Amino acid sequence: MDKAQQDALKKAAGIEAAKLVENGMIAGLGTGSTVKFLVDELGRRHQEEGLEFTGVTTSRRTQAQAESYGIKIVDIDDVDHIDVTIDGADEVDKNFNGIKGGGAALLWEKIVATNSNQIVWIVDESKVVDTIGKFPLPVEVIPFGAGQVIKKFEARGYKPVLRLDADGKEVRTDENNFVVDLHLERIDHPQELAEDLINTVGVVEHGLFLNMVDKVIVGDPNGPRVMTNANK
């Protein structure tokens, strides 16, 4: 699948997911290449159809994009609930376990998600896998002592790599932390790994989102299809 085909599937999933946002709602808006298409469609509906809703974003990038369309964006602490959060995912399996954080927004994404009545992910078909872990697992760590955390990860066989930008500088999250990517290839026991990571001093959050999502809208060549989590 080339990039143009992949983008077409992402766009189709984003447009389908935008239908979930209705007048008067408080909607969580995620981060990433697929969410960009979602926000474009919500912006179009706001400007052309008069859709009025309030957004809570998981990154400053998404906030800037939404506000460029005139969409009202507020801080998460200024709302008492979020009706639905729509976000992307880097991988998702049949048990609705996912990896997120390829865009370095995993902490804000998880905070918004855990305060939402409904969580929806939008992905293209390449993101649906049998076993998660092929995509490097992002872990957000504070800069102080980050090298020590990386050594611990190396000792556990997690194959950590500090994420750098195109200039060779450390990638910084919106909270000014570092991102360490774990090249695990496959994750057979995600719950155990999640507990190990979050109990490591210096780790702020990890990109494992386990059985959190309610629906996954998959961009498919035959049209968007919906995976529904029966355990939620």
UniProtKB/Swiss-Prot annotation:
Keywords: Isomerase
SUPFAM superfamilies xrefs: D-ribose-5-phosphate isomerase (RpiA), lid domain, NagB/RpiA/CoA transferase-like
Pfam families the UniProt entry points to: Rib_5-P_isom_A (PF06026)
Domain of life assignment: Bacteria
InterPro entries registered for this protein in UniProt: NagB/RpiA_transferase-like, Ribose5P_isomerase_typA_subgr, Ribose5P_isomerase_type_A
Catalysed conversion reaction: aldehydo-D-ribose 5-phosphate = D-ribulose 5-phosphate
GO molecular function list: ribose-5-phosphate isomerase activity
Signal peptide positions on this chain: none
Gene3D superfamilies: 3.30.70.260, 3.40.50.1360
GO annotations of cellular component type: cytosol
GO biological process, one term: D-ribose metabolic process
Amino-acid positions noted as binding substrate in the UniProt annotation, renumbered to this chain: T31, G32, S33, T34, D87, G88, A89, D90, K100, G101, G102, G103, K127
Stretches of the chain forming a coiled coil according to its record: none
Pathway the protein contributes to: Carbohydrate degradation; pentose phosphate pathway; D-ribose 5-phosphate from D-ribulose 5-phosphate (non-oxidative stage): step 1/1
Active site residues of this protein: E109
Similarity comment text for this entry: Belongs to the ribose 5-phosphate isomerase family.
Quaternary structure, from the entry: Homodimer.
Function field: Catalyzes the reversible conversion of ribose-5-phosphate to ribulose 5-phosphate.
Stated name of the protein: Ribose-5-phosphate isomerase A
Protein species of origin: Bifidobacterium longum (strain NCC 2705)
Gene this protein is translated from: rpiA
